[in-house]
């Protein structure tokens, strides 16, 4: 119900949260405007909606994502970088403004409207967008000619631009880096595009796409792996851990039983997990351009549940999931973060947190019934074709 109320019916776009300026740290500066739609949410939204049987809503959001892809490719002039976020109507003027005459909850400042991250380079969005398209395609709604042409243009662009620093999934304001998560998602983008092209017989430069996909894989496995930490790290020049990498087995980049992955998960257990709750990373060890600290991330905790379940630690996954449920409010809703004393922090309710909750519940239930592994339960279940929107 909450996710449907956060969806703009004319376009199917889902806002990240209906609020702005609720602080990630009481009295701190980590206050953002979330009243927009992130491309990043697409894959996780489509997966959750399909898992709950809301195929029409999944198709509508998938079509909204495709429309954004078409805007940046398929016109015969090559592709251009997508924006990472848009207004619900698809426009992208999100200039950030500080409202000096306001203060947020318990004096938290500054209060911002708009979002300066809209102009950042975040290469992971291509993986999340193509994963959403692939999930929709797997349920019968294949890309139309214009849509596929735009996707092909976009993948050709990505082949030429994936190997560069960006601001990353956490939208840091401390400079661009070679973030491992972004590289993983670039691999996802090309992998899913190859699957669609081969499965549907669509024209594509498959040799180029496969070559670059494999180059990304080799780079991540060598430069993303830190032999001293015995873990995959946040970016190539650090020993800092990052819970965004919990998606590596979720996206099929590594086996959930790969020894390198199991060592990474063990390292996260020790450094990023506190009483079953998961931090994104250590801001003091990896400066992100902002002051202060933050709470644990609800999204990351649910990713942790999923990763534990797929890696065979079903008892641990159940315990973390049950513990996390105790932090919801009286309506079962979550904000973006949870503080050290159990208070909810950040914008509320946050779509990403609830999408991750749904996905973790679906996957945990499937693993408990069928045994741990990397089978994708939504696609493993029988399901009819998705109706074409409109």
Description of each model-found segment:
Residues 1-390:
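Acidic, mature catalytic/reactive cores of soluble proteins
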